[in-house]
Design a protein with these regions (language model features):
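Glycine-rich flexible loops
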Residues: 1-145
């Protein structure tokens, strides 16, 4: 699991606009990332998951999804391997950025259909070539910096 305070994702946790996949690299978001609102479980808090009970509630909110948004706090991303969870965390941020940019354009957005996302996800398991190639690229970039 990766937890982040992704600045482009947080607005989706506090609005009525769901974070939905807008490109194939974020098909795992389909149909949309659920929002965990700690206030509904524990009332007024500091928004931190500080007890086992809150952790269980967050896990239940995640369900079978790869990403859950934490209202006013950030997001949590899961995967079967380190490479997959890092890929998903980065693609979640990128998808949020793209979705926000598209929302500024005129007209309705065309999100990935659940059927399209299912086809992408069927070939995007933890050992997928796309994830492996992207991981190797990121490793090489980090060596150069």
């Amino acid at each position: 699991m990766i937890h982040s305070h992704s600045p482009t994702v947080i607005p989706f946790s506090i609005s009525q606009t769901p974070l939905q996949p807008v490109f194939n690299g974020a098909a795992f978001l389909s149909p949309s990332a659920p929002v965990f609102d700690i206030r509904k479980i524990a009332g007024m808090t500091d928004l931190l998951i500080g007890t086992g009970e809150l952790g269980k509630a967050l896990s239940a909110s995640l369900g079978e999804n790869a990403v859950v948004l934490l209202r006013g706090h950030g997001n949590a991303v899961v995967g079967e391997t380190l490479q997959q969870v890092v890929y998903r965390a980065i693609q979640t941020e990128l998808n949020a950025r793209l979705q926000l940019q598209a929302m500024m354009l005129d007209g309705p957005l065309i999100y990935m259909a659940p059927e399209e996302a299912a086809k992408v996800n069927a070939r995007s398991g933890p050992d997928a070539t796309q994830i492996g190639r992207t991981w190797e690229l990121w490793k090489e970039r980090s060596r150069r910096q």
